[in-house]
From Swiss-Prot:
PANTHER family: ALDEHYDE DEHYDROGENASE-RELATED (PTHR11699). Pfam families: Aldedh, Formyl_trans_C, Formyl_trans_N, PP-binding. Cytosolic 10-formyltetrahydrofolate dehydrogenase that catalyzes the NADP(+)-dependent conversion of 10-formyltetrahydrofolate to tetrahydrofolate and carbon dioxide. May also have an NADP(+)-dependent aldehyde dehydrogenase activity towards formaldehyde, acetaldehyde, propionaldehyde, and benzaldehyde. The N-terminal hydrolase domain has an NADP-independent formyltetrahydrofolate hydrolase activity, releasing formate and tetrahydrofolate. The C-terminal aldehyde dehydrogenase domain has an NADP-dependent dehydrogenase activity. It catalyzes the oxidation of formate, released by the hydrolysis of formyltetrahydrofolate, into CO2. The modification N6-acetyllysine is found at K882. This is Cytosolic 10-formyltetrahydrofolate dehydrogenase. The active site is at H106, E673, C707. Phosphopantetheinylation at Ser-354 by AASDHPPT is required for the formyltetrahydrofolate dehydrogenase activity. It comes from Pongo abelii (Sumatran orangutan). GO terms for biological process: 10-formyltetrahydrofolate catabolic process; biosynthetic process; NADPH regeneration; one-carbon metabolic process. The modification Phosphoserine is found at S9, S629, S631, S825.
């Protein structure tokens, strides 16, 4: 059918895309005018497809349709109007014009909750069922005949966002497509809306969202969640307007210890606790609010409302005192040598061993059914008094660490809703940068802004290092066993796997990674890396060494491998999450704490990773993430006296500067993975089909943004022309396109500056006399797309023969048949030595060449075959130190020698 889509937002965009995939012809997209220079997603998508787009600021004047608007609409010849989400008033001349009329999506089960704030009122009224309706438009307000309805359960703590993201958005898109399909098949019903149960409520605005405290707790809870996030339920307290978010009902009946917050009109004062703000209804029942927005717009954890409020010991209720005495009896049974267990009794000083810890934990868990208690809790609260305080906090659901408030950027993309933190991550909290400084991170697929990201300053680096140092020296990270540390890393890997599709989607958005590749490599290998190093945690061990005895006495000498302390990890933009994982997994497995500086142009998966560390239970301060510039954040990390190790992946030029800074500051330990110009030698006796396939992968894998990419191919003369012919044939089959499309082979380059460098690189190659066989230009479409490129006749003196492109540019040079030593000399005539490769069926030749190639990795009859268990790192100016494998652990450990005499 010929369809006019009238609406806006990501929902409108998705409906538009799905209708086109169904084979319908969208003849026009009608959306709202650009706001602050930013076009609506529906309009952007339609313009990209060449569909006419109209952005009328109004459709009628003085109650009459504008003739010009009607004429432009009628010229399209639409057979059906589809209104997925439309905030404008559309004249009946337009509504009734098509052969099949118009259908509208409404996010409630009509006739209930007619009006623009239907989702809000579904929650405010405490409806147990929610859903959406698709109806035939008429001249009433949401009164047209019903075509289709779908319902879902409304969860007790659902908010507008959670209900929309879980059901109304994804299922609503499917519902609109289904409705159009029914119309096309002539099977669409027209069911009059019943009058019984019909309601209409007005638009929820800030001025109408004030909380009425004279009602039960459940009604207050429904009011808060029904206005979360927009417009926000508010009250006046402490001489300012406070807006409440993230409400849950508290059914425990126990009022946690906290500080009173007087609220005018409330039945009782609120109580600020470590879990959040306890509020009371007029029925004396409670609800808990996790987040508060202050009058100046700043969002804070409700538990932090009274900054500087001292933490005091909990006063136990009668029931809790009974529990405490039962636990005292458990301690007494485990510690028979202790006459009487007092608050000051120390579990371990009283003779308990690790096996007793297990017994204590299991007995207490059985005593307190449903309690989550772990071995490390005993080590962190080893006296009876501290243990009871910890136990009661857990029983009350009052987490001592507190919960992190995350201001997400939410996006509906790749058939899912992704939630991305965008602030700095310091000491277990997402916070704004000093001075609230931010910058834009760009989607390379179309050049659009994804979101604003906090831009770290020097003071932020100092705060992050201080948090990491405190976590290392005083926190529980250094006190838990190596095996428990491994368990936390395994849990983190599991969470990364649970979020694998979301992480891959973020990599595609932020870095231009092809989604299908990101699932397997960018994210898949990241998960494997954390699992691999989690297994190493309890296998890091020293040795005993026989030395000359100090006769007549004897000696025992042993070594211990210890973490170095606070580490700075500076990662590149080509594999944002994988490069983070390669270094951070080994760093954490060794017992260090870390400050991570992601590449400024690709910060988002690092911030999502930070969120997952919290969910995994990694203690606060162990992992910190600072998006920002290398010249500021990276430099401060290199200079900081409390940072003991820098792990860096990037250019040789910057690596040299970091090495110098580390030496001058405090002689930091350094590992560097730097530039490359990896040679790939293809002999005439190779399997040519495999050589072509792997040669393509060696250059074009991940758009050529690959540190070990084959920077130069040496092809034996007798097969050179056939090799080039086959490569060009394969290049022309590659699909360049949106990285989220499942059939895309080649996505956009990472950022605009890099695209421009690739253009200059190819222009210089042509200027110096190399033959440009194909490619060499930007793809004529929005975004930072560059054509897969092939150069031949490349001589050793040329710029492109010596310098890395870091892009999809294949550099091919000939070498004379049988001249193995000369081609080896040419391959090694570079200051780089990251990787290399050889293709031959001759095992003797393969062994000889692999011996002679001066590179940290040599691939024989394969390429790009890295593995988490195999050490990875370069020679010469490609750096030193290893990622992956057991060798990587040594980069984050120091060896201590201990000698006894007896």
């Amino acid at each position: 059918m010929k369809i006019a889509v009238i609406g806006q937002s990501l929902f409108g965009q998705e409906v538009y895309c799905h209708l086109r995939k169904e084979g319908h012809e969208v003849v026009g997209g009608f959306t709202v005018p650009d706001k602050d220079g930013k076009a609506d997603p529906l309009g952007l998508e339609a313009e990209k497809d060449g569909v006419p787009v109209f952005k009328f600021s109004r459709w009628r004047a003085k109650g009459q349709a504008l003739p010009d608007v009607v004429a432009k609409y009628q010229a399209l010849g639409a057979e059906l109007n589809v209104l997925p989400f439309c905030s404008q008033f559309i004249p009946m001349e337009i509504i009734n014009a098509p052969q099949h009329g118009s259908i509208i999506y409404h996010p409630s089960l009509l006739p209930r909750h007619r009006g623009a704030s239907a989702i809000n009122w579904t929650l405010i009224h405490g409806d147990k069922k929610g859903g959406f309706s698709i109806f035939w438009a008429d001249d009433g307000l949401d009164t047209g005949d019903l075509l289709l309805q779908k319902e879902c359960e409304v969860l007790p703590d659902d908010t507008v966002s959670t209900l929309y993201n879980r059901f109304l958005f994804p299922e609503g898109i499917k519902g609109m497509v289904q409705a159009v399909r029914l119309i096309a098949e002539g099977k669409a019903p027209r069911l009059p809306q019943p009058e019984e149960g019909a309601t209409y409520e007005g638009i929820q605005k800030k001025e109408t969202a004030k909380i009425n405290w004279d009602q039960p707790a459940e009604a207050i809870h429904n009011w808060i969640r029904g206005n979360d996030k927009v417009p926000g339920a508010w009250t006046e307290a402490c001489e300012q307007k406070l807006t409440f978010f993230n409400s849950t009902l508290n059914t425990s009946g126990l009022v946690p210890e906290g500080d009173a917050l007087p609220i005018p009109g409330a039945h009782r004062p609120g109580v600020v606790t470590k879990a959040g703000l306890i509020l009371f209804g007029n029925d004396d029942k409670m609800l808990l609010v996790k987040n508060i927005q202050l009058e100046d717009g700043k969002m804070i954890l409700a538990s932090n409302f009274f900054k500087g409020a001292a933490s005091s010991a909990l006063e136990l209720t009668e029931a809790e005192l009974v529990t405490a005495e039962a636990v005292r009896s458990v301690w007494q049974r485990i510690l028979p040598n202790v006459l009487e267990v007092e608050d000051s009794t120390d579990f371990f000083k009283s003779g308990a061993a690790s096996v007793d810890v297990v017994r204590l934990v299991e007995e207490v868990k059985e005593l307190c059914d449903g309690l989550e208690l772990e071995n490390e809790d005993v080590y962190m609260a080893s006296t009876f008094g501290d243990f009871i305080q910890l136990l009661v906090r857990k029983l009350r659901g009052d987490d001592e660490e507190g919960e992190c408030s995350i201001d997400y950027v939410e996006m509906a993309v790749n058939k899912r809703t992704i939630r991305i933190p965008h602030q700095l991550f310091i000491g277990g909290e997402f916070v704004d940068a000093e001075g609230a400084k931010t910058y834009e991170t760009i989607n390379p697929t179309d050049g659009s802004v994804i979101c604003q990201v906090s831009l770290a300053q020097v003071t932020d680096v100092d705060k992050a290092v201080a948090a990491a140092k405190d976590a290392f020296e005083n926190g529980r990270w250094g006190k838990i066993s190596a095996r428990d540390r491994g368990r936390l890393l395994y849990r983190l890997a599991d969470l990364m796997e649970q979020h694998q599709e979301e992480l891959a989607t973020i990599e595609a958005l932020d870095a231009g990674a092809v989604y299908t590749l990101a699932l397997k490599t960018h994210v898949g290998m990241s998960i494997q890396t954390f699992r691999y190093f989690a297994g190493w945690c309890d296998k890091i061990q020293g040795s005993t060494i026989p030395i000359n005895q100090a006769r007549p006495n004897r000696n025992l000498t042993l070594t211990r491998k210890e973490p170095v302390g606070v580490c700075g990890i500076i990662i590149p933009w080509n594999y944002p999450l994988m490069m983070l994982s390669w270094k951070t997994a080994a760093c954490l497995a060794a017992g260090n704490t870390v400050v991570i500086k992601p590449a400024q142009v690709t910060p988002l998966t690092a911030l999502k990773f930070a969120e997952l560390t919290l969910k995994a239970g990694i203690p606060k301060g162990v992992v910190n993430v600072l998006p920002g510039s290398g010249s500021l954040v990276g430099q401060r990390l290199s200079d900081h006296p409390d940072v003991r190790k820098i792990g860096f992946t990037g250019s040789t030029e910057v690596g040299k500067h970091i090495m110098k800074s580390c030496a001058i500051s405090n002689v930091k330990k350094v590992s560097l993975e730097l530039g490359g110009k990896s040679p790939l030698i293809i002999f005439a006796d190779c399997d040519l089909n495999k050589a072509v396939q792997m040669g393509m992968s060696s250059v074009f894998f991940n758009k050529g943004e690959n540190c070990i990419a084959a920077g130069r191919l040496f092809v034996e003369d007798s097969i050179h022309d056939e090799f080039v012919r086959r490569v060009v044939e394969e290049v022309r089959k590659m699909k360049v396109g949106d990285p989220l499309d499942r059939d895309t082979d080649h996505g956009p380059q990472n950022h605009h500056a890099h695209l421009m460098k690739l253009m200059e690189y190819c222009q210089r190659g042509v200027k110096e006399g190399a033959t440009l066989v194909c490619g060499g230009n930007q793809v004529p479409r929005p975004g930072f797309f560059f054509e897969p490129t092939v150069f031949t006749d490349v001589e050793d003196h040329m710029f492109i023969a010596k310098e890395e492109s870091f892009g999809p540019v294949m550099i091919i040079s000939r070498f004379a048949d049988g001249d193995v030593d000369t081609v080896l000399s040419r391959a090694n005539a570079t200051e780089f030595g990251l990787a290399s490769g050889v293709f031959t069926r001759d095992i003797n030749k393969a062994l000889y060449v692999s011996d002679k190639l001066q590179a940290g990795t040599v691939f024989v009859n394969t390429y790009n075959k890295t593995d988490v268990a195999a050490p990875f790192g370069g020679f010469k100016q490609s750096g030193f130190g290893k990622d992956l494998g057991e060798a990587a652990l040594n980069e984050y450990l120091r060896v201590k020698t201990v000698t006894f005499e007896y």
